[in-house]
Regions:
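N-terminal auxiliary segments of SAM/dcSAM-dependent transferases
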Residues: 2-33, 37-157
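SAM-dependent Rossmann-like transferase core, predominantly class I methyltransferases
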Residues: 119-195, 199-209, 358-360
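Conserved SAM/SAH cofactor-binding pocket of Class I
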Residues: 177-264, 268-272
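Short "lid" loop at the C-terminus of a central beta-strand within the Rossmann-like core
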Residues: 266-267, 284, 309-314
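Glycine-rich S-adenosyl-L-methionine
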Residues: 275-299
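Conserved beta-strand signature within the Rossmann-like core of class I S-adenosyl-L-methionine
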Residues: 301-309
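Short, electropositive alpha-helical surface patch
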Residues: 312-330
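Class I S-adenosyl-L-methionine
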Residues: 324-371
């Protein structure tokens, strides 16, 4: 969030797309080593790099190497798995905070003055929409993330179920995990299905798959304006926009449907940035709101599809019977369960601190009907 901080030159706006606290102050330095910048960071002082851009990237890499050295403590899963998860997230947050203390000054109209700096205009337009008329400070690590996201957006993500690509800008969750899309493409549809809702559409990929499967009238909803714009562009690009009406609303439209699909965030924890709201759902708020509200929006004999993994159970963040209790409370009956194993890199990375849970993870599609 924007916040004005003092520097050794003048007060200036500090921007950070996470929920981290702004530094107390910042100092402009031509060049410095990783040790000096980290020392400043521990004192809540940001370092603004005014020298060569490529040198700044090298120093940032050195900072990452320093703070991500393996712990001296015995490796392996904690006896308290839930504690291990929260400790992992805390460590990630602390490391991110330190890395974000190396910043650059963004000149008006999204420009950089640093030597050998790239053109960042398009990448920052994806994030902020309106170009700046005054300079501001931005963590270098975040800037590099914005540039990477912009390149991914241009390239697009191949979606085999669509025989096409989905393009996702910064601020919208990217469907890099394809296993749940297979479930949506394979789950049986009722004969003569006419209407469907995609709740929390994000990039629009689920709505697109439903349209590709022949459902003629789909409403896709989201509360994120960036997601609405993203989904709209993707469906137009895929030639599926005539079948899908995209609405900026929370959860359900006022009408009813034959099929209602939701892929809520899978982990009940607090997000630390806007993009993490697609990953973390405090107290399973969206999950329970969907289940408790979906019944009254289903047409007679209609189905609700819930896509969710059991990672939260393996991390001891959710009881194994939690979902069944939610289904009972919402007067929903499970008529079928489809499942698959994740294929993404973290699922098979034994060096991942949460590998002990990820290698047990299964992704499910629950087909639900009103009792």
């Amino acid at each position: 969030m924007p916040h004005t901080i003092p520097t050794n030159r003048s007060d200036i706006e500090w921007r950070n797309e996470s929920t981290q606290k702004s530094p107390k102050q910042a100092v402009y330095i031509q060049e410095a080593g990783a040790a000096e910048i980290l020392k400043n960071a521990h004192a809540q002082t940001a370092t603004v790099w005014t020298g060569d851009f490529h040198n700044a990237k090298q120093v940032l890499a050195a900072m990452k190497k320093r703070i991500r050295r393996p712990s001296e403590k015995k490796k392996g899963a904690s006896a308290d798995i839930q504690t291990a998860f929260h400790a992992h997230r805390m460590k990630q947050a602390q490391q991110s905070h330190l890395l974000n203390m190396l910043a650059v000054e963004i000149q008006p109209n999204f420009q950089l003055d640093n030597a050998r700096s790239p053109d960042i205009y398009a990448a920052l337009r994806d994030v902020y929409d309106t170009p700046n008329d005054k300079p501001f400070l931005l963590p270098l690590n975040q800037l590099l993330g914005f540039i990477g996201a912009h390149e991914w957006n241009k390239k697009g993500i191949d979606i085999p179920q669509l025989d096409g690509k989905i393009h996702v800008p910064f601020g919208v969750f990217s469907p890099l995990r394809g296993e749940y899309l297979d479930l949506i493409a394979q789950a049986p549809l009722a004969p003569n299905i006419q209407t469907a809702f995609d709740i929390g559409t994000g990039s629009g990929v689920i709505a697109a798959i439903l349209a590709k499967r022949g459902i003629p009238n789909i409403i896709a909803t989201d509360t994120n304006p960036k997601a609405i714009a993203c989904a709209t562009a993707n469906l137009e690009r895929l030639g599926l926009d005539k079948a899908v009406n995209i609405q900026l609303i929370d959860l359900f439209p006022e009408s009813c449907a034959d099929l209602i699909v939701c892929n809520p965030p899978w982990l009940p924890a607090k997000p630390t940035s806007a993009i993490e709201t697609a990953l973390y759902d405090p107290n399973h708020a969206m999950l329970t709101a969907f289940l408790n509200g979906v019944r009254k929006h289903l047409n007679p004999n209609g189905e609700a599809w819930l896509i969710i993994s059991d990672l939260a159970e393996h991390l001891h963040l959710r009881d194994k019977d939690f979902l069944n209790q939610c289904f009972q409370t919402a007067s929903l009956n499970v008529v079928d369960i489809l499942k698959t194993k994740p294929q993404h890199k973290k699922a098979i990375d034994e060096s991942d601190p949460l590998a002990f849970a990820r290698n047990k993870e299964t992704t499910y599609l629950y087909r639900l009907k009103a009792i």
